[in-house]
From Swiss-Prot:
Taxonomic source organism: Haloquadratum walsbyi (strain DSM 16790 / HBSQ001)
Annotated signal sequence range: none
Gene Ontology molecular-function annotations: heme binding; metal ion binding; oxidoreductase activity
Compositionally biased residues, Low complexity: 318-338
The protein's name in its UniProt record: Putative heme-binding protein HQ_1094A
Location of region: Disordered: 269-340
Length: 531
């Protein structure tokens, strides 16, 4: 008998697909349709806000094609809670206009394929690994516009039988599979849950993305990995667009959804999502985050990118490129979570915030150590960080016009960023940026410049810098350049107050600079506001 990897289970998952009886809907009197929309919205709001349970996550999607019209996805701590959520929907007037063409039941799972030591002696595992594993067992639906779902199994045929292979060979294939997923860091978030004994396939795979073609691309590319090409068997695929509960009526009227630009994430009782979870993994062993966990930060996983270290087929990553620096940006990072992380990291002289429109957290530390000394230390940390699926990037940046270096560490989850902060705070010669004067700081993260325009970009920065020195409330602005990629930069700016910075962002000079930048940047700038 082949060796069986140990597993541990977490939250249960229900994909509840619904088809609308459009003939009955059109023929129903207005008051009945209004009642159906009303209690349908109430049901969806209640479950997205987790009013029905102590913990969990829920979301609703408009499914394209003939296979279904609506998908309601629930993550809950118990199977009973899932059953209750499903049955409560049937009590609504809206349910009378729908049928359930299919559904899928599974449970979040971790296995010992790539972290056998964790199962052998979990008490000896570092805190980061323990938090990461817990995150995989309690995934949350991320703030992404689209979701794809499909079930899959590992082949048990006469020629190719996954379960006959030695465990080392299985682990090796999954590790290789995970490397493919790393390419989708910042694009795909995936949740994988085991359905062995629960449903018709062995795993249910849910992929979340802001660009639906990323879902297509990652599935396509991973088909060529040996673990999928020889051993993967796939079920029916579904694709849907997320919408807020309040837009149920608009959906049924054939209107565009969402009806207004908004954050579709409902408040939940659980924090940041931590990635996929499953045991014998239908996919690669690390899903992009590497396969082993070093002694690293861990609130969630950090691996050079895409996803967790346990078996993953796709990327558990997130982060989209959005960045209009308008006044609305200021509200993005004044929410409770950002305030909490900034307060906690302030003790380490680390400045943290969340880029506007992105599901990543950036922590920034300033140091007066030499670049060689700092880079050597960061390389060591990064080697450990890269074992975690929620690690997006850690790099050293050097100020262009003065002796000041910055270490920027970007993570998919707040908990991972907080844990990583404890490590980077121990870097040499950390200085408190607040020493320049307390006030409001803003960073334009990830100005990736086309190489042929790098000199022109530097000249433009000098011109804008001259304008800044004349502005009320401006303290200091530095152009920070990545030691490993001179086209990767960020602008760090310190102001007396938020309103002083916003005055500049509303100015014609800033608008003209942004417009000019569209031609010289290889991607749109993404801004982080740090109060």
């Amino acid at each position: 008998m082949s060796e069986v990897p140990p597993t541990d289970e977490g939250w249960f998952v229900l994909h509840d697909f619904r088809t609308v009886d459009w003939d009955a809907w059109r023929e129903a009197p207005t008051h009945r349709r209004e009642a159906a929309v009303g209690d349908g919205v109430e049901y969806l709001r209640k479950h997205e806000s987790i009013a029905d349970a102590e913990e969990g996550s829920s979301a609703v999607f408009s499914v394209l094609g003939h296979k279904a019209d609506i998908l309601i996805t629930h993550f809950r701590p118990t199977l009973d809670a899932l059953s209750r959520a499903e049955r409560q929907f049937e009590q609504t007037t809206f349910a009378g206009f729908t049928t359930q063409p299919t559904s899928y039941v599974s449970v979040a799972e971790i296995s010992g394929y790539t972290t056998p030591g964790y199962f052998e002696n979990p008490d000896a595992a570092d805190e980061g690994l323990r938090q990461y594993m817990q995150g995989k067992l309690t995934p949350e639906i991320p703030n992404k516009d689209y979701a794809g779902f499909y079930p899959m199994s590992k082949r048990r045929g006469e020629t190719y039988n996954w379960y006959d292979l030695p465990i080392d060979e299985r682990a090796e294939m999954m590790e290789a599979h995970a490397e493919t997923g790393k390419e989708y860091a910042g694009k795909i978030k995936q949740v994988i849950a085991s359905s062995v004994g629960f449903d018709d396939y062995e795993w249910g795979v849910t992929l979340f993305a802001d660009d639906p073609t990323d879902i297509k691309d990652i599935v396509y590319e991973m088909r060529f990995d040996e673990v999928s090409a020889k051993y993967g068997e796939f079920g029916t695929f579904y694709i849907g667009q997320r919408f807020p509960p309040a837009d149920l009526g608009a959906l049924l009227e054939g209107k565009a959804i969402p009806t207004v630009e908004q954050d579709v994430d409902a408040p939940t009782a659980h924090g940041e999502a931590h990635g996929h979870a499953h045991g014998d993994s239908p996919h690669g062993s690390g899903g992009g985050g590497g396969s082993s966990h070093g002694q690293s930060p861990g609130g969630a996983s950090a691996g050079g990118s895409a996803h967790g270290t346990e078996d993953a087929d796709h990327s558990d990553s997130r982060s989209t490129t959005s960045a209009d620096t308008t006044q609305s940006d200021t509200s993005t990072n004044t929410n409770t979570q950002d305030s909490e992380i900034r307060e906690q990291l302030a003790e380490y002289d680390i400045y943290a915030g969340q880029p506007h429109g992105e599901d990543v957290y950036a922590t920034v530390l300033y140091s007066e150590a030499t670049t060689d000394e700092l880079f050597s230390e960061v390389e060591g940390l990064r080697g450990n960080f890269d074992h975690y699926g929620t690690h997006v990037k850690t790099a050293v940046y050097e100020a262009r016009n003065r002796h000041r270096n910055a270490v920027v560490s970007i993570w998919e989850t707040q908990s991972a960023a907080e844990t990583a902060a404890g490590f980077i705070s121990e870097l040499p010669d950390v200085v408190s940026r607040a020493g320049e004067e307390s006030g409001f700081g803003t960073m334009g993260m990830f100005y990736t410049v086309k190489s042929e325009y790098r000199g022109e970009f530097n000249d433009t920065f000098d011109t804008v810098g001259g304008i800044l020195t004349e502005m009320d409330g401006h303290q200091q602005t530095d152009l920070m350049i990545n030691l490993e990629d001179e086209n990767d930069m960020f602008i760090s700016s310190q102001w007396d107050a938020r309103e002083d910075a916003m005055s500049f962002f509303r100015s014609d000079e800033f608008s003209e600079t942004v417009e000019w930048g569209r031609d010289v940047l290889s991607e749109r700038p993404r801004h982080v506001f740090l109060a």
